[in-house]
């Protein structure tokens, strides 16, 4: 849902837009996590079809990772996550990067760093502020943009990404507290939805001067694995995000609205998981569900 367009049209007197906004507001529920100014994020549960979640569960149960090289999957996850951030390295060059440890370009280094970050998460049990700071150091080692606002822990300056102006640096401690209270809290029982909320919030607060997108994607997969969905260690969600990058950024932008409603981003992540699982199963010649383009169905 594009709130900016609807709110503009409602201000211009469009009855349909006004009515749609009123209905969406009435259907919204507060989430147990607040933005930098203390407003609760919201979502609209009725805009997330139960059939989508059921199909995801069906497909996940049929995934066989015995025929998937997990190491290669980690390499490809690192590659696609960095391609989203502008790395020019091609997939044909991955062999030289991982086998010969080639670091000729910034993109090469970004990919190797992201690979190292996955390995770090695999052996680290803690999920707290210190873990994120170490993760940031690994991801941006030798390739950090905006080092002038790196700060002692978090960024020390204001950051604007597209139309999003991240919270002021002095509000980041509060945001980080919100993030981990939600992360460790017994709140949203559906792991895919909770992973989407965590992903959005991390990108929203943008705690570091660089590497936030890569870290958010790492944390998404990591959270799913830690929720008992171990097969995601062999899947590459960033591949699907890379292939649908404009929709990824549009979903983030649509989730910046006066209602604090992040349903658009939750829908995007669920569709990403669905499409990724469907592709993997198709490659394994397994046809578990009839493909649905959920983008056309989401209200």
Enumerate the predicted regions with their spans.
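FIC/Doc superfamily catalytic core
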Residues: 1-299
């Amino acid at each position: 849902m594009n709130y900016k367009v609807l709110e503009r049209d409602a201000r211009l007197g469009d009855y349909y837009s006004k009515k749609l906004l009123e209905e969406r507001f009435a259907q919204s529920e507060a989430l147990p996590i607040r933005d930098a100014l203390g407003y609760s994020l919201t979502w609209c549960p009725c805009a997330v079809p139960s059939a989508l979640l059921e199909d995801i569960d069906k497909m996940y149960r049929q995934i066989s990772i015995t025929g998937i090289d997990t190491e290669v999957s980690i390499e490809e996850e690192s590659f696609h996550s960095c391609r989203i951030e502008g790395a020019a390295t091609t997939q044909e060059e991955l062999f030289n990067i991982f086998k010969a440890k080639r670091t000729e370009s910034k993109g090469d280094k970004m990919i190797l760093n992201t690979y190292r970050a996955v390995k770090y998460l695999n052996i680290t049990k803690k999920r707290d502020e210190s873990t994120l700071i170490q993760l940031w150091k690994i991801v941006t080692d030798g390739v950090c943009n905006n080092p002038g606002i790196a700060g002692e822990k978090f960024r020390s300056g204001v950051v604007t990404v597209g139309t999003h102006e991240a919270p002021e640096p002095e509000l980041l401690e509060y945001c980080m507290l919100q993030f981990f209270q939600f992360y460790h809290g017994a709140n949203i029982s559906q792991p895919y939805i909770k992973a989407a909320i965590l992903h959005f919030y991390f990108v929203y607060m943008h705690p570091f001067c660089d590497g936030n997108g890569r870290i958010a994607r790492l944390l998404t997969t990591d959270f799913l694995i830690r929720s008992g969905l171990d097969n995601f260690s062999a899947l590459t969600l960033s591949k699907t995000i890379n292939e649908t990058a404009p929709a990824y950024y549009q979903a983030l932008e649509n989730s910046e609205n006066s209602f604090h409603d992040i349903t658009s981003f939750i829908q995007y992540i669920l569709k990403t998981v669905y499409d990724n699982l469907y592709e993997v199963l198709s490659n394994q010649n397994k046809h578990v569900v009839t493909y649905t383009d959920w983008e056309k169905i989401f209200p």
